[in-house]
Curated annotation (Swiss-Prot):
This is UvrABC system protein C. It comes from Nitrosococcus oceani (strain ATCC 19707 / BCRC 17464 / JCM 30415 / NCIMB 11848 / C-107). The gene is uvrC. GO terms for cellular component: cytoplasm; excinuclease repair complex. The lineage of its organism: Bacteria, Pseudomonadati, Pseudomonadota, Gammaproteobacteria, Chromatiales. Belongs to the UvrC family. Keywords: Cytoplasm, DNA damage, DNA excision, DNA repair, Excision nuclease, SOS response.
């Protein structure tokens, strides 16, 4: 604060609502906040002797404050949320997982398709969700397909069918692609799907019971049995997912908190069904109350995101009225934030709180273990500072083909999978591991973007270390410590040899060392990720090479085949007649293509 005159700053500061950004000596944003009265709020940081220790540490680092005036406090709340997401300031509560959530999508076609969707809702149709993860979407789609045989195939596959596919044979689809069901009957199935996804499953069951009784009365026992099985399946799903007599869309939020770590558990209730839950572990700096944490979480998580009509909260934020107003305006309808004190909603909160506490305790135990191992690693390698970020590179190939390099990232929280990177290596001599490593490191560090690691771990010995040092020197990076971890005899864990850049002799370490354990963990994770990436590349490349080896199938025909059928997977699933319908593909050529993938 040596060069920052707070008195002069406050003299010229407006009492209007707005957002403030506190910066350090390097111009890096330390904290973003909102205020109904900017002058009063910022003044409180410098005139209040009862500030929390975290705030004292923050204030000492402030060298500048930037403000943005807004018309209303509502606008300030929205701007604050957007700036926190964009700038990731150290002293704000930060959500590490801000991915878009998956939905079940029902297309607007004449014969609609059920499928998975994530991202911007650009395609016309109906969206149901959000679901907490991809797995819960696929589980629901699988259940729906068993009860309502509505198509789930991609449009390219659907349009090019000349006969029913396997899904029809196993009674998971009614084959609208070849006209085996009328539009009226198919629409009835679609109506039932929509009713079910909106929580009106009992109404669907009632309709199916009427149909079953009608079929039985007409002595159509096979049809009656068909409806009976559907009803039984729906009741099984009800028993598994049902949570409430209220057929509403609700999110239930529970908070568990310690001095430096927090957990927010969100349960997704849609139409009375529990779709599952998701755990959030926000990054904290200093003490917060559960109410403050929940306020920040709601602003970051629900602004610019679809919000259900009701949020049930374990704690009541002070600015609940402001949050309600802003979220309602964003949604174009009333959003209710409720802190229940009695009734069934209290049981939902107990469920969310119990899960939040369990997940927080589990994460605390894991973090304590990782922190101890990082500390041991710092001591083993005589690092000046505690390692905040470790990156590990590994190269994978089979006899020099489809070479892939992986980069995994660990910090004191464990693996940061959002930062993992895969590099498809090209233009090298087959089997040249040094060349592959050089290319991967160049692509990772050349632009000097993102956060650099304190420690760079290479799966290999002195040769790989020297190659890494040459690349870093060429780029102009000198502050990264480089460590090689070479496999021991027979590749047994515990027999690894560690080589630290700049030292001739290996680092002496015992097999029970926590430092060695964390390095093994990171190395194994890099190896796993490299193998998975390599398999994906090899599988794709293998199928493409199979196409290239088919006599009479040149580049133009291959391209037409891929476009019209919608990719390699659809080509492998297509029959001879389907292939022959593509322009330029004769029946004889179609047979050759089919034979290649069905030997």
């Amino acid at each position: 604060m040596a060069n920052f005159d707070i008195d002069d700053f406050l003299r010229n500061l407006t009492p209007c609502p707005g957002v403030y950004r506190m910066l350090d000596a390097k111009g890096k944003v330390l904290y973003v906040g909102k205020a109904k009265n900017l002058k009063r709020r910022i003044k409180s940081y410098f005139r209040n002797s009862k500030l929390a220790p975290k705030i004292h540490v923050l204030v000492k680092q402030i060298c500048d404050i930037k403000i943005t005036v807004t018309h209303t406090e509502n606008e300030a709340l929205i701007l604050e949320s957007n700036l926190i997401k964009a700038l990731q300031p150290r002293y704000n509560v930060l959500l590490r997982d801000d991915k878009s959530y998956p939905y079940i999508f029902l297309s607007a076609d004449d014969f609609p398709r059920l499928g998975f969707h994530r991202g911007v809702k650009q395609v016309s149709g109906q969206y149901f969700g959000p679901y907490p993860n991809i797995r819960s979407v696929w589980q629901t789609l699988k259940l729906l397909q068993r009860v309502f045989p509505v198509r789930q195939c991609e449009d390219n596959f659907y349009r090019n069918r000349s006969r029913p596919c396997l899904q029809y044979q196993i009674k998971r689809c009614t084959a609208p692609c070849v006209g085996l069901i009328s539009k009226k009957d198919y629409s009835q199935d679609i109506q039932h799907v929509v009713m079910f996804l909106k929580g009106r499953d009992q109404q669907v069951i009632n309709e199916l019971v009427i149909r079953m009784e009608e079929a039985s009365g007409q002595l159509a026992f096979e049809q009656a049995a068909y409806y009976r099985d559907r009803i039984a399946s729906l009741r099984q799903i009800q028993a598994r997912q049902y949570i409430s007599g209220e057929k509403k869309d609700i999110d239930v939020l529970g908070v568990a908190l310690t001095e430096k770590m927090a957990c927010v558990e969100v349960f997704f209730i849609r139409g009375g069904h529990n779709l599952g839950n998701k755990t959030f572990l926000p990054k904290l700096e200093g003490n917060l109350t559960p109410e403050e944490l929940l306020s920040t979480f709601i602003a970051q998580y629900y602004l610019n995101r679809e919000t259900p009509p009701i949020l049930i909260l374990s704690h009541q934020p002070k600015d609940m009225g402001l949050l309600t107003e802003v979220l309602s305006k964003q949604a174009g309808r009333k959003i209710a934030l409720i802190k229940p004190v009695r009734g069934p909603k209290v049981q939902w909160i107990k469920m969310a709180l119990a899960n939040a506490k369990i997940n927080l305790n589990q994460h605390l135990a894991e973090k304590s273990n990782i922190t101890a191992r990082f500390k041991s690693l710092q001591q083993l390698l005589s690092l000046a500072n505690f390692p905040q970020r470790i990156e590990c590179f590994d190269v994978s190939h089979i006899q020099g083909t489809a070479t892939v390099a992986s980069c995994v990232v660990f910090d004191r929280e464990g693996p940061r999978k959002a930062d993992y990177r895969r590099f498809n290596i090209t233009g090298i001599i087959p089997g040249d591991d040094y060349g592959a490593l050089r290319q991967a490191l160049m692509r990772r560090f050349k632009k000097k973007e993102g956060v650099f690691p304190d420690l760079l771990v290479i799966d290999g010995g002195k040769g790989q270390i020297n190659q890494s040092l040459r690349v870093l020197k060429e780029i102009g990076i000198t502050e990264i410590t480089v460590l090689g971890i070479a496999k021991g005899p027979e590749r047994k864990a515990g027999n690894e040899t560690l080589f630290l850049a700049g030292y001739e002799n290996p680092v002496m370490v015992t097999s029970d060392s926590p430092a060695l354990h964390i390095l093994q963990h990171i190395r194994d994770e890099a190896h796993r990720f490299a193998i998975v990436s390599h398999r994906k590349r090899r599988a794709k490349g293998g199928k493409l090479s199979l196409l290239e080896g088919i006599s009479g199938l040149g580049p133009k025909r291959r391209r037409k085949l891929l476009i019209q059928l919608g990719g390699l997977q659809e080509i492998t699933r297509a029959g001879v007649e389907d292939l022959a319908q593509i322009e330029g593909i004769s029946l004889e050529l179609a047979q050759r293509i089919y034979d290649v993938f069905h030997r």
